[in-house]
Amino acid sequence: MALTLEPGVTVEAGRYTALVSPPGFLVDVLLQPEVDRFETLYCYGVGSRVLGRLPRQAPRLALQSCMTVHQLLASLREAHQSIVIVEYDDGIFSPLEGDDRDVIFAVGRTLRELAREAAVLLWAPRGDRGLRALLLLADQVVWHYDERPAGSVAPARRRRHEVQVTLADAV
């Protein structure tokens, strides 16, 4: 059982994979026939950027909303499905500071342990500080972007202006 992300890049049991991509790319992954053939758990935070984009004949997913990191940890520890997909929600990870940041690493360790028995995919639309901590423990990290985001175009270099001169020197 494997989900194909790109030619030569698969999500399979025994491997914890992190995917950073636009939501539409994950929708395409979720529409693969393998998702319907195997029990699939989809964990998301307060809201999902992906679930609303699925068509009406969406695959069968066991959905689990996790409002806190601790709820996410509990859901992952109880997971028995063949495929586990976690939608990263920066809203539940960003408030963690100081000693609470250890909880992020606990999530990463739990995802890695779960990958021994299931295909585990962590998805995020972009990287941030909390996600970087989760990426450290991933077996493979896939960044998938077809186009450059609109704001990523480098601004044109400005010409150097001549040194200012006083009015007396200009005349």
Residue ranges and their predicted role:
Residues 1-171:
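N-terminal regions of ATP-driven nucleic-acid and macromolecular assemblies
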